[in-house]
Amino acid sequence: MRIVLQKVSEASVTVGSAVVSQIKHGYMLLVGIGTDDKLEDIDKLSKKILTFRGFDDDAGYGWKRNISEVDGEILCVSQFTLMARTSKGTKPDFHLAQRGELANELYGQFMDKLKAGLGDDKVQNGVFGAMMSCKLTNEGPVTIIFDSKA
């Protein structure tokens, strides 16, 4: 499982012409589920994201507070392309990306764990499997990659 976390001052997801979800201050997560990912990977990375100290304290010292301590929000977007292999040729190989139904199930479990830890109203979602337009304002910029196998 791979996650690209971006610290944002705002983010939104649009499908077609409709904004389907949006957040203010928090994290936008791009989430890739691999063929060998299990519930243990979901547990590991959901805990890591919820406890990750990506925010300054009141005195301005960095990396001191987690998402709940700043009353932040999370916007998750399913992103199978994070599992691409690019070591051979000029075209990405997506064989390591989990296929539809099982990926959706694991992604749903990941979302449930984030909501349980942060609150239903604090975790938003894109549309699984849809072609989406993602807009964000990256703060810092802070972009961190998490990998459950690393």
Curated annotation (Swiss-Prot):
InterPro entries: Daa-tRNA_deacyls_DTD, DTD-like_sf. It comes from the Eukaryota. SUPFAM superfamilies: DTD-like (SSF69500). A motif (Gly-cisPro motif, important for rejection of L-amino acids) lies at residues 140-141. Keywords: Cytoplasm, Hydrolase, RNA-binding, tRNA-binding. NCBIfam families: D-aminoacyl-tRNA deacylase. An aminoacyl-tRNA editing enzyme that deacylates mischarged D-aminoacyl-tRNAs. Also deacylates mischarged glycyl-tRNA(Ala), protecting cells against glycine mischarging by AlaRS. Acts via tRNA-based rather than protein-based catalysis; rejects L-amino acids rather than detecting D-amino acids in the active site. By recycling D-aminoacyl-tRNA to D-amino acids and free tRNA molecules, this enzyme counteracts the toxicity associated with the formation of D-aminoacyl-tRNA entities in vivo and helps enforce protein L-homochirality. A Gly-cisPro motif from one monomer fits into the active site of the other monomer to allow specific chiral rejection of L-amino acids. Belongs to the DTD family. Homodimer. This is D-aminoacyl-tRNA deacylase. It comes from Kluyveromyces lactis (strain ATCC 8585 / CBS 2359 / DSM 70799 / NBRC 1267 / NRRL Y-1140 / WM37).
